[in-house]
């Protein structure tokens, strides 16, 4: 996980529980608000979408761009965060 943000490392370091969507790497207040408006208020709801898309990086990034207008970097950071979390806990 070299080159990852502190936010990414913090998220991947422990079970997800009831963390807010804004605790995901790449998701700040603006994107978090857009995701919440779309019904994705908790990190586990975004994880659910990631799993529904069968962990496919391009599909997930496209979904992020469509739902909350994430940039490529934001979508990539979120994907990598969820992917690393799944490797650790699933």
Swiss-Prot record:
Gene Ontology terms describing biological process: chromosome condensation; chromosome organization; oocyte karyosome formation
Keywords annotated in UniProt: Chromosome, Cytoplasm, DNA-binding, Nucleus
Compartment annotation: Nucleus; Cytoplasm; Chromosome
Keyword Manganese annotated: no
Assembly description: May interact with MAD1.
UniProt similarity note: Belongs to the BAF family.
Protein name: Barrier-to-autointegration factor
Species of origin: Drosophila melanogaster
């Amino acid at each position: 996980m070299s080159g990852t943000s502190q936010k990414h490392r913090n998220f991947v370091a422990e079970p997800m529980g009831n963390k807010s969507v804004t605790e995901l790497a790449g998701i700040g207040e603006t994107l978090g608000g857009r995701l919440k408006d779309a019904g994705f208020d908790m990190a586990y709801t975004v994880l659910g979408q990631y799993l529904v898309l069968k962990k496919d990086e391009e599909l997930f990034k496209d979904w992020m761009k469509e739902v909350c207008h994430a940039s490529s970097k934001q979508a990539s950071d979120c994907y990598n965060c969820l992917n690393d979390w799944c490797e650790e806990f699933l």
